[in-house]
Amino acid sequence: MISNGPGDPSAMPYAVKTIQNIVSADEKMFGICLGSQILAQAQGMKTFKLHRGHRGQNHPVKNLVTGKSEITSQNHGFAIDPETNNGSVEITHVNLNDDTVEGIKVKGKPAFAVQYHPEASPGPHDSRYLFDEFVSSLA
């Protein structure tokens, strides 16, 4: 589990290197918020500072795998640049307000992450399935 946290993921090259090693070892991984940005950087993607951060409990996100929309809680000021995807990452979720990346999965690896906060309570519970998927992958 790569937890959330404050700040610019580019200031954490040590974390990016650690995640590269974990992904290379085929370890199972679930990233949340900052963890999503670090996983993206570990796959060669870049992040950027949002003009206006995503803050609050009513951000609509589309799951591109299922086609369903989810209401999410968010609190981040950086985003993943989809133009820097070298093909190693599948973009799984996008923000319906501004089309920013909200979820990724590393192709061929048991590693995925979301930019928002599925653990947030009180708040929307549309994304609780992510924890079920991660726990199931551990079995």
Regions found by a protein language model. Give the residues of each.
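Conserved Rossmann-like nucleotide-binding pocket used by diverse enzymes
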Residues: 30, 92, 112
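Short, glycine-/Ser/Thr-/acidic-enriched flexible segments
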Residues: 7, 77, 118-119
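N-terminal Rossmann-like NAD(P) cofactor-binding module of classical short-chain dehydrogenase/reductase
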Residues: 1
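Cysteine-nucleophile active-site neighborhood
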Residues: 4-74, 124-126, 130-133
